[in-house]
Amino acid sequence: AEIDFSGIPEDIIKQI
């Protein structure tokens, strides 16, 4: 997914 700190990307959250 595209990295958007404005709403926090779900893909990044799942990786964490």
From Swiss-Prot:
Expressed by the venom gland. It is found in: Secreted. One of its GO terms (biological process) is killing of cells of another organism. It comes from the Eukaryota. Its main location: secreted. GO terms for cellular component: extracellular region. Keywords: Cytolysis, Secreted. May act to induce hypotension. Presents moderate hemolytic activity at physiological concentrations (micromolar range). Does not induce mast cell degranulation, lactate dehydrogenase (LDH) release from mast cells and antimicrobial effects. In vivo, injection into mice causes an increase in nociceptive sensibility, but causes very reduced or no edema formation. It also reduces mice locomotion, suggesting an increase in anxiety, but causes no alteration in rearing (standing on hind limbs). The primary structure of this cryptide Pep-1 is identical to that of cryptide TyPep-1 from Tityus serrulatus (AC P84189). This is Cryptide Pep-1. It comes from Tityus obscurus (Amazonian scorpion). The lineage of its organism: Eukaryota, Metazoa, Ecdysozoa, Arthropoda, Chelicerata.
